[in-house]
From Swiss-Prot:
PROSITE patterns: CNH, PROTEIN_KINASE_ATP, PROTEIN_KINASE_DOM. It catalyses: L-seryl-[protein] + ATP = O-phospho-L-seryl-[protein] + ADP + H(+); L-threonyl-[protein] + ATP = O-phospho-L-threonyl-[protein] + ADP + H(+). SUPFAM superfamilies: Protein kinase-like (PK-like) (SSF56112). It holds the Pfam family Pkinase. Residues 344-360 are annotated as: PEST2. It comes from the Eukaryota. Residues 425-442 have a biased composition (Low complexity). Polyubiquitinated through 'Lys-48'-polyubiquitin chains, allowing proteasomal turnover. Ubiquitination requires the kinase activity of MAP4K2/GCK. Autophosphorylated in response to tumor necrosis factor (TNF), endotoxins or pro-inflammatory stimuli. Autophosphorylation leads to activation. It is found in: Cytoplasm; Basolateral cell membrane; Golgi apparatus membrane. Residues 16-273 form the Protein kinase domain. This is Mitogen-activated protein kinase kinase kinase kinase 2. The active site is at D136 (proton acceptor).
Length: 821
C-alpha cells in the first residue's frame, strides 16, 4: 500500500475524542468528535485500510478537501494514519444532511429549495473554477450547520479536470442523480463539470418531492432509460404548486445536451437564485426538523384507517382441558410429521442463512450494467450481518454511490412489448445455456455474491424446536377462539429480541402473536388495513391490502419499536392513526409499492443461481416484475408487461431455470391420467415478453392442475384434484421419486415435507411418502373444517366447527422440528 500524502502519522486520539457515530460516507463511517485543542466539534471519517487497497480515491478526497477552502465546502482540519486506520477530520455540520431533514419535515418550501440551490451553486462554482468535479451531488451530501449554512460534503468520488484531460471517462456517481452523459459515458465520449449542474437539478426535485425522479425503478433500469437517446429530462410532477421561475431553473439545469447546459456561475444569475433568500429560511427548517409534530400529513393515512374500530388487542379464550379437546387436537399430539422442506426458490431472510463472499472480477461480463454492479460492490467492501448493524444509526447516505468502474458499453435492451414477444411452446420449459456474448439481465446489488447456505441456523425464542429429531414434529395450538377473518399468515423472528411472532393478515387488519409469550395469549394489532396476502423478506413485511388493494411494504422492526414506544406513553386516541399522521410518507414505516393498485395476487421467488429475488404482481390488465434491491431494502420495478394474463386471478407460479436470469411464469398445467404421463406446463417467458395468445385449459376441467410448486432446481410438485405428480421442469416424471401420489379426497392445499407430501382437505390431512406413495400421516376430524393459512417456512393451520362456519377459529403451527429460523 503506497503512502498517503499530507497525512500525519501521529496518534489522532491525542487530539480528537470520538463522541458518537453519525453516519457513513463513501468509504468509511463518520463520527462526531471533539477537538481537544480548540474544544470545537469535528466530523471524523475513519477508513480501515488493508494491504493492497487502492488508496487513490482517498488521496483524491484529502487533496480536494485540503485545496478547496470555501464557505460552502466542508472545511478540512487534517488527516491521520494510525494502525491501518485513516482518520479524515473535517468541520462538523450540526444540522445534518438535507436528506435527514426532509425525512423529518416533509418537502421543503420553494424558497428553501432556492436557498439550498444558490449556496450549493456557489460551492460548485468554486470547485469547477479549480478544475474539480464533485460527481455525487444529492440531498445526502449537502450538509447544514446550525446557522443554516449549506456545505458540499463527501468528496470520495470527486475527480479533477486538467488541461490534458478535458473530460472524465469513468462511470461514477449515484444512479438517480446521474447525468445522461455519465450514464452513456462510452457512447458520449466523456463528461465534464456540468454533470454536477444536472445532479443539483435532480436534487432540487428531490427536496420538493422527497425522492429523485425514476426512484421507483431499479437503479439499473433507470440507468438504461437515461442512456437512451429518447430519454426526456424530468420535470416537477405538480406544475401548479411551483412558480415559473422554479420550472425554468430546472429546465436549464436539466438540459440534456451538456454543451447547452449552463454553468454553475450562469445559474447563480437566474431569478430563482437571485431573489431575496435569507439564512432564516433554513434555520426555520432546522427548527421544524427538531419538532416532529410539525411534520406533514401523509396522503396515505386514509388507507391505514380502514378498521380502527376493531380492538387493538385480542385475547385467546381459555384452552380446553384434555377431555374437551376436539378429535383432531388429540390426534395432533399423536401423529408426528417431518419438517417442511425448504424450497430453493425461497428468499433467504436471515443473516445466518447465507455467507456472502465476493467473487473475482473475472466472473463479470463486459456490460455497462455489470460495471455499475461492480461499482456498487466496491461501495460496500465489507458486508456485515444485520445483527451487527442493528445497534448503529442508519447511514446518512441511504442510496449507494457508484464509484470506480471499467469503461464499458451498454448492451442492447430487449423490448417488453407483448407484440414483440416470442412464444413458448406449452409443456416445455426450455433453458438453453447463455452464450458467451449474452449479457446478464439487471443483476442485483448482490448478484456477484455467492451464497453458502449450509450454516447452522441460530436459535430463536418461540415454539420449542427439537433439532435433529426425525419425524418429531406435531401441530400445536397457539390461539383459541380467534374472531378475525384471516386470509394469510406468516412467522417472523425479531432480529433484536429473537422472539418468534405469528403475523396474520385479516379483514380487520394485520395482527401479531408473540410465540415466546403464549402464556399472555394476546394478539396485538400492527396495521389497521384489510389484508389478503402476506410475505416476509429481510424483515420487510409485504402485504396485499388497503381499500383499493395495493402491495404495501412494512418495516417490521420499526413498527414493533413504534408500538413499544406507544405502550410506554399511551394516548387517548388510537395511536396507530396519530403516528402515521406525523410521519412524512417518505419516512413512513408502511409504504405503497407504486403502480400496484388493483393487484389481484402476488408471488415472491428467488433465483438460486444468481441470488436475485423477484416479486410478481398480477393486475387486471398487466403483470409487474419487481426486483429486490438490497441497498434500499425494497422491491423496485424491473418490467411492466402491458399484456394481460390469460387469467389474472388464476394460477400464478414462478419457475426458475438454470441459465435464465428472470423467472418464467406458469399460468396453468395439465396432465393426462396415468403416473407415467408427462405434465404440460403453460408458461410465459418473461425475458421474451408475455405471449398473449397462449391457450390455457379452463380451471376445473379434468386434467387441470390446481397447484404447482417448485421445490428444488429441477423438481416440481403438480397437484391435481386427487393426486400429486412429481416431475422435472420438462414435465417428465422423476426417476428417484414416486411419479404419482394418490389421495381419496379432493385436495385443497399441498405442502412438501422433508420426505413426504402433506395434502390438506376440508376435514383433515394425509401425508404420503415421496419414495413409496405409502401413507405416513393421517388426521381426520369431520367436526372441524381446516384451512392452511401459510406454508412459507412454517405451516400455519386454522380450524372452525363444521356445524358453525361463522364461529371463532383455532390456530395451529407445525412445531417440534428443527427451527425454521
Amino acid at each position: 500500500m503506497a503512502l498517503l500524502r499530507d497525512v500525519s502519522l501521529q496518534d489522532p486520539r491525542d487530539r480528537f475524542e470520538l463522541l458518537q457515530r453519525v453516519g457513513a460516507g463513501t468509504y468509511g463511517d463518520v463520527y462526531k468528535a471533539r477537538d481537544t485543542v480548540t474544544s470545537e466539534l469535528a466530523a471524523v471519517k475513519i477508513v480501515k485500510l488493508d494491504p493492497g487497497d487502492d488508496i487513490s480515491s482517498l488521496q483524491q478526497e484529502i487533496t480536494i478537501l485540503r485545496e478547496c477552502r470555501h464557505p460552502n465546502v466542508v472545511a478540512y482540519i487534517g488527516s491521520y494514519l494510525r494502525n491501518d486506520r485513516l482518520w479524515i477530520c473535517m468541520e462538523f455540520c450540526g444540522g445534518g444532511s438535507l436528506q435527514e431533514i426532509y425525512h423529518a419535515t416533509g418537502p421543503l418550501e420553494e424558497r428553501q429549495i432556492a436557498y439550498v440551490c444558490r449556496e450549493a451553486l456557489k460551492g460548485l462554482h468554486h470547485l469547477h473554477s479549480q478544475g474539480k468535479i464533485h460527481r455525487d451531488i444529492k440531498g445526502a451530501n449537502l450538509l447544514l450547520t446550525l446557522q443554516g449554512d449549506v456545505k458540499l460534503a463527501d468528496f470520495g468520488v470527486s475527480g479533477e479536470l486538467t488541461a490534458s484531460v478535458a473530460k472524465r471517462r469513468s462511470f461514477i456517481g449515484t444512479p438517480y442523480w446521474m447525468a445522461p452523459e455519465v450514464a452513456a459515458v462510452e457512447r458520449k465520449g466523456g463528461y465534464n463539470e456540468l454533470c454536477d449542474v444536472w445532479a443539483l437539478g435532480i436534487t432540487a426535485i428531490e427536496l420538493g418531492e422527497l425522492q429523485p425522479p425514476l426512484f421507483h425503478l431499479h437503479p439499473m433500469r433507470a440507468l438504461m432509460l437515461m442512456s437512451k437517446s429518447s430519454f426526456q429530462p424530468p420535470k416537477l410532477r405538480d406544475k401548479t404548486r411551483w412558480t415559473q421561475n422554479f420550472h425554468h431553473f430546472l429546465k436549464l439545469a436539466l438540459t440534456k445536451n451538456p454543451k447547452k447546459r449552463p454553468t454553475a456561475e450562469r445559474l447563480l444569475q437566474h431569478p430563482f437564485t437571485t431573489q431575496h433568500l435569507p439564512p432564516a429560511l433554513l434555520t426555520q427548517l432546522l427548527d421544524k426538523a427538531s419538532d416532529p409534530h410539525l411534520g406533514t400529513l401523509s396522503p396515505e393515512d386514509s388507507e391505514l384507517e380502514t378498521h380502527d374500530m376493531f380492538p387493538d388487542t385480542i385475547h385467546s379464550r381459555s384452552h380446553h382441558g384434555p377431555a374437551e379437546r376436539t378429535p383432531s387436537e388429540i390426534q395432533f399430539h399423536q401423529v408426528k410429521f417431518g419438517a417442511p422442506r425448504r424450497k430453493e426458490t425461497d428468499p433467504l431472510n436471515e443473516p445466518w442463512e447465507e455467507e456472502w463472499t465476493l467473487l473475482g472480477k473475472e466472473e463479470l461480463s463486459g456490460s455497462l450494467l455489470q460495471s455499475v454492479q461492480e461499482a456498487l460492490e466496491e461501495r460496500s467492501l465489507t458486508i456485515r450481518p444485520a445483527l451487527e448493524l442493528q445497534e448503529l444509526d442508519s447511514p446518512d447516505d441511504a442510496i449507494g454511490t457508484i464509484k470506480r468502474a471499467p469503461f464499458l458499453g451498454l448492451p442492447h435492451t430487449e423490448s417488453t412489448s407483448g407484440d414483440n414477444a416470442q412464444s413458448c411452446s406449452p409443456g416445455t420449459l426450455s433453458a438453453p445455456p447463455a452464450g458467451p456474448g449474452s449479457p446478464a439481465l439487471l443483476p442485483t446489488a448482490w448478484a456477484t455474491l455467492k451464497q453458502q447456505e449450509d450454516r447452522e441456523r441460530s436459535s430463536c425464542h418461540g415454539l420449542p424446536p427439537t433439532p435433529k429429531v426425525h419425524m418429531g414434529a406435531c401441530f400445536s395450538k397457539v390461539f383459541n377462539g380467534c374472531p378475525l377473518q384471516i386470509h394469510a399468515a406468516v412467522t417472523w423472528v425479531h432480529p433484536v429480541t429473537r422472539d418468534q411472532f405469528l403475523v396474520v393478515g385479516a379483514e380487520e387488519g394485520i395482527y401479531t402473536l408473540n410465540l415466546h409469550e403464549l402464556h399472555e395469549d394476546t394478539m396485538e394489532k400492527l396495521i389497521s388495513q384489510r389484508c389478503s396476502w402476506l410475505y416476509c423478506v429481510n424483515n420487510v413485511l409485504l402485504s396485499l391490502s388497503g381499500k383499493s388493494t395495493h402491495i404495501w411494504a412494512h418495516d417490521l422492526p420499526g413498527l414493533f419499536e413504534q408500538r413499544r414506544l406507544q405502550h410506554q406513553a399511551p394516548l387517548s386516541i388510537p395511536t396507530n392513526r396519530i403516528t402515521q399522521r406525523i410521519i412524512p410518507r417518505r419516512f413512513a414505516l408502511s409504504t405503497k409499492i407504486p403502480d400496484t393498485k388493483g393487484c389481484l395476487q402476488c408471488r415472491v421467488v428467488r433465483n438460486p443461481y444468481t441470488g436475485s429475488t423477484f416479486l410478481l404482481a398480477a393486475l387486471p390488465a398487466s403483470l409487474l416484475l419487481l426486483q429486490w434491491y438490497e441497498p434500499l431494502q425494497k422491491f423496485l420495478l424491473l418490467k411492466n408487461f402491458s399484456s394481460p394474463l390469460p387469467s389474472p386471478a388464476g394460477m400464478l407460479e414462478p419457475l426458475v431455470l438454470d441459465g435464465k436470469e428472470l423467472p418464467q411464469v406458469c399460468v396453468g398445467a395439465e396432465g393426462p391420467e396415468g403416473p407415467g404421463c408427462r405434465v404440460l406446463f403453460h408458461v410465459l417467458p418473461l425475458e421474451a415478453g408475455l405471449t398473449p395468445d397462449i391457450l390455457i385449459p379452463p380451471e376445473g376441467i379434468p386434467g387441470s392442475a390446481q397447484q404447482v410448486i417448485q421445490v428444488d432446481r429441477d423438481t416440481v410438485l403438480v397437484s391435481f384434484e386427487r393426486c400429486v405428480r412429481i416431475v422435472n421442469l420438462q414435465g417428465e416424471p422423476t426417476a428417484a421419486l414416486a411419479p404419482e401420489l394418490t389421495f381419496d379426497f379432493t385436495i385443497e392445499t399441498v405442502v412438501c415435507l422433508q420426505d413426504s407430501v402433506l395434502a390438506f382437505w376440508s376435514h383433515g390431512m394425509q401425508g404420503r411418502s415421496l419414495d413409496t406413495n405409502e401413507v405416513t400421516q393421517e388426521i381426520t376430524d369431520e367436526t372441524r373444517i381446516f384451512r392452511v393459512l401459510g406454508a412459507h417456512r412454517d405451516i400455519i393451520l386454522e380450524s372452525i366447527p363444521t356445524d358453525n362456519p361463522g364461529a371463532h377459529s383455532n390456530l395451529y403451527i407445525l412445531t417440534g422440528h428443527q427451527s425454521s429460523y
